Amino acid sequence: MLYKVLSKRGVPIRLTDERWAHITEEHCELAGLRLDILETVANPSRILAGYKDELLAVREINPGKHLVVVYREMASDGFIVTAFLTTRSKSLDRREQVWPK
């Protein structure tokens, strides 16, 4: 099954079955959070610059715990690369904030 949401820039971002399998195999704690992952891309608290043109959508899901969704945008399409949970807000704070400016 293919899921899509719009990024803050209005670009459709895909979550494919293959990427979902990767996310849940590497980060089993995210198995029940597919909708949270999509919601984080659509409505992040902030977007950070990643590596090689990746973007990191970040949303706090519990006090001190952030859901980070790594995705790529092309001109009219995009896709989710991976996602993970972190409590390391200081490492996130070191990245360039893309949105909001």
Predicted ranges, named:
Residues M1-K101:
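Ribonuclease/tRNase effector modules and their secretory precursors
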